[in-house]
């Protein structure tokens, strides 16, 4: 097989997906975003499974990866809708932390150019041990950074889906041709 086969391309796409998911996982951990952490963890496992299936010529594993990419695209579309507040969703809810904490996206306070300062909490808000933080001067708002992360994940997943279907087709055709000899 040549270097630029569909199989090699799928290996490259899966590796790139894993790197992007690991980067996203780190920032979700920093922001205590438990729902995305769980999703990223499952995604990394399935991408490893897809890599293994591609390297070892196991079409069933690649099929599992292909099915997962459909769920992964749907999850990332949900994330985009969540941060852009589409359909009654609100980025100010605790949905991403399973309603167990008031943490938000790490990018909310640490985005490019953001300057944050502690301010006294209004008496009407009971924040417990948490501080009230004012963030100003961000070059790009945190929700757009999250949307960009999800859009990159969707793009890689769609490309991975196409190449996975192609590789499955090639592998099964090779198996069929070997059986008929």
UniProtKB/Swiss-Prot annotation:
The chain crosses the membrane at residues 5-22, 35-55, 62-82, 151-171. InterPro entries: Na/K-Atpase_Interacting. Pfam families: NKAIN (PF05640). It is found in: Cell membrane. It is a multi-pass membrane protein. Keywords: Cell membrane, Membrane, Transmembrane, Transmembrane helix. GO terms for cellular component: plasma membrane. Interacts with atp1b1 C-terminus. Belongs to the NKAIN family. This is Sodium/potassium-transporting ATPase subunit beta-1-interacting protein 3. It comes from Xenopus tropicalis.
């Amino acid at each position: 097989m040549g270097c630029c086969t569909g199989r090699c391309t799928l290996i490259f796409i899966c590796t790139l997906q894993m790197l992007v998911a690991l980067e996203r996982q780190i920032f979700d951990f920093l922001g205590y975003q438990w729902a995305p952490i769980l999703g990223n963890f499952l995604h990394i496992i399935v991408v490893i499974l897809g890599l293994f299936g591609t390297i070892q010529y196991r079409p069933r594993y690649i099929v599992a990866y292909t099915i997962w990419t459909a769920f992964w695209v749907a999850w990332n579309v949900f994330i985009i809708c969540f941060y852009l507040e589409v359909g009654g969703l609100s980025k100010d809810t605790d949905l991403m932390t399973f309603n167990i904490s008031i943490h938000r996206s790490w990018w909310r306070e640490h985005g490019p150019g953001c300057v944050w300062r502690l301010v006294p909490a209004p008496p009407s808000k009971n924040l417990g041990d948490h501080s009230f933080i004012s963030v100003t001067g961000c070059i790009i708002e945190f929700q757009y950074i999250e949307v960009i992360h999800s859009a990159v994940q969707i793009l890689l997943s769609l490309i991975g889906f196409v190449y996975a279907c192609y590789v499955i087709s090639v592998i099964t055709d090779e198996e069929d041709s070997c059986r008929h000899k």
